[in-house]
A protein has these predicted regions:
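N-terminal beta1-alpha1 cap of cysteine-dependent amidohydrolase-like domains
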Residues: 2-8, 12-126, 135-136, 142, ...
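Active-site glycine-centered loops adjacent to acidic/histidine catalytic or metal-binding residues
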Residues: 127, 185, 221
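Hydrophobic, aromatic-enriched interface-forming segments
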Residues: 130-132
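Short catalytic/ligand-gating loop segments at beta-alpha or beta-beta junctions
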Residues: 180-186, 210
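Beta-strand-turn-beta hairpins that frame and shape the catalytic cleft
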Residues: 195, 212-215
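Short, surface-exposed beta-strand/loop micro-motifs that present aromatic residues
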Residues: 206-212
Length: 247
């Protein structure tokens, strides 16, 4: 697997190395099938293409050198949704049977996240991606909202409103103090990592978005809403792609 990934990365550098001047290349993390195949809904790549980027699905990496090689190819990275982040990463044991973990992906995403942070690549973190980045930066998660949090909002399979913080990326893009978003998660940020700015919450207080100068993180799935015909979410991806093009 290590040799195969090295060959893939070498090919990627050869193919994309001279294309950055025209279109930014944006990496996207992905899940794995039971047999180890890379899995990613096309909604992510479609959204990035619509925003003017060349999307590049990133297979799992196994060491810092591979993660660094990926960063040589991409101008930014999207951390996508998927499995739950292993609670051991934030000092807890598994809460209950609802927690589904892929330790191989956790390690890969952690390596990619740390490499992206180290070299200043713009990051868009979606759902699991938001949770992952919060953990990487020193925060923790609710492992299972239905059993750990008493809230008034249904966070799985529903839509609901979120309140936006003035001066945030989302508030600036949409010129409003609230948005309606989809919701399909059972985990969420519990203790925010030091240094991050919480920029959106649901009515019951769950973190729905946060940011740093390098990261925009959302708990909801803008790519799914865009794919369903809600073009209002394209500006979020365009703003991210614009940031990657400035590097």
């Amino acid at each position: 697997m290590k040799l195969r990934l090295s060959i893939i990365l070498a090919g990627m550098i050869a193919v994309f190395g001279c294309s950055h001047a025209s279109m930014p290349v944006v990496g996207v993390s992905c899940s794995r099938s039971g047999s180890g195949s890379a899995l990613l809904p096309t909604t992510y790549t479609d959204a990035l293409r619509s925003a003017g980027a060349v999307p590049l699905v990133i297979p799992t990496v196994s060491d810092e050198a591979q993660a660094a090689a990926v960063m040589e190819v991409v101008d930014g990275i999207v951390f996508s949704g998927g499995e739950d982040v292993n609670p051991a990463w934030y000092g807890e044991s598994v809460w209950n049977e609802t927690v589904e973990i892929d330790s191989v992906r956790d390690r890969s995403d952690s390596l990619l996240a740390r490499a992206a942070l180290a070299c200043g690549k713009p990051v868009l973190a979606i759902c699991r991606g938001s949770q992952l980045m919060n953990v990487i930066l020193g925060g923790s998660l609710y492992q299972d909202l239905p059993s750990q949090f008493s809230g008034s909002v249904a966070h799985s399979g529903k839509t609901h409103k979120i309140g936006l913080e003035e001066g945030s990326v989302l508030a600036g893009l949409y010129g409003t103090d609230s948005l309606t978003v989809n919701s399909m998660h059972h985990q969420a940020v519990k203790d925010p990592a030091p240094g991050i700015r919480i920029t959106a919450r649901s009515a019951d207080g769950i973190v729905e978005a946060w940011e740093t100068p390098q990261i925009v993180a959302v708990q909801f799935h803008p790519e799914k809403m865009l794919a369903a015909g809600d073009s209002a979410w394209l500006p979020l991806f365009k703003a991210f792609v614009s940031r990657t093009a400035q590097r």
